Amino acid sequence: MNQVMTIFLVLGVIVYSVESSLTPSSDIPWEKCRHDCFAKYMSCQMSDSCHNKPSCRQCQVTYAICVSTGCP
């Protein structure tokens, strides 16, 4: 079950990345907010702290909280 969630999250990240690169950048606040949250998520995933599954799970949780509470 956890692997399935991870696969869907990774696919979502890939789709979001492709969509972000294909669409012209806009000044819509929620798009910028989601982009900022995603940038933080990618930074977390690439960091040394994400060397085991629990640490990487925290990156996912932090991203979800960022989007749900910080973006309009």
From Swiss-Prot:
GO terms for molecular function: metal ion binding; toxin activity. Expressed by acrorhagi. Disulfide bonds join 33-71, 37-66, 44-59, 50-56. The keyword Metal-binding applies. It is found in: Secreted; Nematocyst. Residues 1-20 form the signal peptide. Has the structural arrangement of two alpha-helices stabilized by disulfide bonds (CSalpha/alpha 4(S-S)). Belongs to the Acrorhagin I family. This is U-actitoxin-Aeq5b. It comes from Actinia equina (Beadlet anemone).
